[in-house]
Structures are given as structure tokens and as C-alpha cells.
Amino acid sequence: MISLVLVLLFSGRVEAVTNWSVDKRFKDNGDKTITDTKTGLMWMKEDSYLHSGHWVNWFESIQFVKKMNEDGFADQYDWQIPSVEQLTTLYEADKINSKVLGRGMNIHIDSIFSKEGGASLWSIEENGYHNAFGVIFNTGKRFNSSKKSRFRKSFRAVRYSN
């Protein structure tokens, strides 16, 4: 790997080095996004907590994605809050990314994603007027919570890759 980088440096060519997960399922695009080659989805590398430094409720996650699209995060304008089904594709019980920020529980997501952050991620799916669903990444189970709750919750935006 080092010789490849040195050859590229001394040859005058500049090329981005693509970083892949160990199992080659996930590709780090080098622009704060990760592409899942199994599902065709592109994800934020960081969850919203790592990106902004604060926990969010469901309503704030909607506004956060709206701002991402206005700003063209990673030169894309079609980011969305994922469904429960999309979120569960990231959960892999045999993989440990890191510990939940401030807790002793493991986050079961590929280590190509940014470390720490939140384990409870919002989905776009509502449960009545006051609640919404999400996925807990230390168990892989769906949760149901008040849309106003910020307690240790974040989200990870998604889009369909080109």
C-alpha cells in the first residue's frame, strides 16, 4: 500500500485511494459518505450526533436532512431519513464498531462508519401522531418513542447511490 501511494506521488498522478470494509461490502467514498454495495444505499459516515455534537428529536432530524439537501451535502440533494427496513440492513450482530457514547454497550455496525455516537437512530416511520420508530444498534431491535424525545437519539441520513 505504501509503495502504491509513493508511486502515485512520484509519478505526478493524484488519485483517491478508496477505502473498503474488510468484507468489501461498504466503500468509503472519501466525502463523508459510505456506499453499501449490497443494498445500493449511500449513508452518512457519521451519525447526526457526531456531525453536530448534539442529540436530536424526530422533528429536528427532519429539519437536519432538509438543511443537508439545501447545502448539497457530499454534492447530493436527495438525502432522506431512512426507513426501519433500511436501518436494519446496517445492523450486523457479528460486527462491533465501538461502544455507545457514554455507555458500555456495543454498536453493531461495520467499523468503516465513524466510531461512537448514538446507538438509537430515528427512522422516517411514524407511529400515530406523537411517536416514531427507530432502530437500536446494540440489539438490532426497533424502538418506539415520542417524536419530541432527544434522549440519546440521533439519525444517519441515506440516499440511493447512483
Each language-model region and where it sits:
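Glycine-aromatic-enriched surface loops/turns that form tight recognition elements
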Residues: 2, 8-80, 84-162
